[in-house]
């Protein structure tokens, strides 16, 4: 067997994913009639001598020397024939040193997974800009995660929720041009602002309002604007009689707001009309077995969709930020098993559609929106990211589905970017009309630094992160302060 790979820093794509290439038999110096990796992949189990005896018969060549090679590799790697185990640093180093041999053994699942990640890394080294290498690999990994789920679960349709599902949808559709999965895609314009009034079918349901949004980040006037679709004509006058309309609420006045609005401001007939408007928009997009995708984080929109449409749906989100989704009754799956350190606006601004944010629905089921202007930096990153997705699709084609890698690993570069460069790249984030602001949850605008008070006491944040945290809080309440600082 030829050692043509050696320990090159950057392999070409065909070398990196040798298992998927038609000329692999030539590079491995085997019989011209035998595609050994594809042939080897048909046999599973621990009885290697028997497997290689049968392989030799099929290939018409003596392949028994490879049996000992694979046995030694398995012994060193401790790779079971029909299972998956995480790699240690020592095993990963061994993989790098023995890359050429490992490409021939498709039974070594962890090796295949490693090769898939190496293919992504090789593409990233073509262009190390954050849009291409970081955001591009992130979109590709999320789209491949969804593609595998679609194939495994047989969804008839995947609906991507606006607006942070837009570019994941674009990536999924670009990959599906070569994967050809029998699935339809849709784009559902919904937001926290549009969905908020739909969570109060009855006046008594308003008691849950403080649990749905951070009311202390609002004034009675701003909160009434969010509840306008279900508010009576005299709601403002009733609130103004007892509360200062332009002063932020505290823990006491928020309950006064709930009491007053529930007794004097809620209009059940307007709710029925608004629900009818929303159903007219949503129902045509949810038929059969469906899946939805959203970045996160608490399944608020998905819960409303399921209640209004009664559809059989599974929600796919990047991660959750509390245990609230587990109490909502909507089946869901997450890409990340834990919440990342940096999320919310820091993540979403790179995924947002260059279009209007949804703020409601009219009587004809049409969407009401409010436009924004994304920063030129973010727009360029999004363009570069889609180039990465297109390059992966064009390079590997339908074989993408056979590329074993953990999507979480493919997202690592973007997570690193969020830690180190997102604030600089997203300095113009205040230009965006963010869905977090629209949904009445100003805390969503803060950067997600996942530490509880107890964790901060045991492991204090570094100075640079504390400064970032303070800057993020200023951004939530005074966007212009960031511009002045920068």
Region roles according to the model:
Residues 1-4, 484-486:
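Non-Sec secretion/translocation targeting segments of pathogen effectors
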Residues 2-79:
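Flavin-dependent oxidoreductase catalytic core characteristic
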């Amino acid at each position: 067997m030829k050692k043509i790979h050696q320990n090159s820093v950057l392999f070409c794509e065909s070398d990196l994913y040798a298992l998927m290439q038609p000329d692999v038999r030539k590079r491995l110096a085997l019989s011209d009639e035998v595609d050994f990796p594809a042939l080897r992949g048909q046999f599973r189990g621990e009885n290697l001598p028997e497997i290689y005896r049968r392989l030799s018969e099929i290939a018409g060549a003596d392949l028994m020397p490879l049996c000992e090679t694979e046995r030694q590799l398995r012994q060193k790697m401790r790779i079971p024939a029909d299972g998956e185990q995480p790699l240690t640093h020592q095993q990963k180093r061994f993989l790098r040193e023995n890359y050429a041999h490992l490409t021939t053994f498709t039974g070594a699942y962890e090796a295949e997974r490693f090769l898939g990640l190496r293919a992504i890394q090789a593409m990233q080294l073509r262009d190390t800009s954050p849009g291409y290498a970081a955001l591009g690999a992130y979109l590709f990994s999320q789209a491949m995660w969804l593609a595998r789920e679609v194939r495994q679960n047989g969804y008839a349709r995947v609906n991507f929720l606006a607006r942070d599902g837009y570019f994941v949808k674009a990536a999924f559709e670009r990959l599906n041009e070569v994967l050809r999965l029998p699935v339809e895609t849709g784009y559902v314009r919904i937001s926290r602002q549009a969905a908020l009034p739909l969570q109060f079918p009855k006046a008594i349901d308003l008691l849950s309002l403080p649990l749905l949004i951070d009311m202390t980040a609002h004034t009675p006037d701003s909160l009434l604007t969010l509840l306008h679709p279900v508010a009576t004509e005299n709601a403002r006058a009733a609130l103004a009689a007892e509360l200062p309309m332009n002063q932020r609420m505290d823990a006491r006045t928020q309950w006064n707001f709930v009491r007053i609005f529930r007794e004097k401001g809620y209009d059940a007939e307007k709710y029925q009309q608004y629900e009818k408007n929303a159903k007219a928009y949503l129902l045509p997009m949810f038929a059969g077995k469906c899946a939805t995708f959203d970045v996160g984080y608490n399944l608020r929109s998905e819960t409303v969709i399921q209640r209004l449409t009664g559809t059989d749906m599974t929600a796919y989100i990047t991660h959750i930020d509390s245990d609230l989704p587990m109490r909502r009754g909507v089946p869901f799956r997450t890409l990340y098993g834990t919440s990342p350190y940096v999320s919310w606006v820091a993540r979403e601004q790179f995924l947002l559609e260059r279009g209007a944010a949804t703020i409601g629905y009219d009587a004809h089921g049409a969407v009401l929106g409010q436009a924004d202007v994304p920063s030129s930096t973010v727009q360029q990153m999004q363009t570069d990211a889609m180039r990465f997705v297109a390059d992966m699709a064009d390079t590997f084609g339908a074989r993408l589905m056979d590329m074993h890698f953990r999507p979480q690993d493919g997202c690592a570069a973007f997570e690193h970017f969020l830690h180190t460069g997102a604030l600089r790249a997203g300095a113009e984030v205040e230009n965006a009309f963010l869905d977090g602001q629209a949904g009445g949850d100003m805390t969503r605008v803060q950067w997600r630094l996942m530490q509880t008070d107890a964790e901060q006491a045991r492991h204090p944040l570094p100075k640079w992160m504390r400064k970032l945290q303070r800057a993020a809080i200023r951004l939530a309440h005074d966007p212009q302060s960031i511009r002045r600082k920068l």
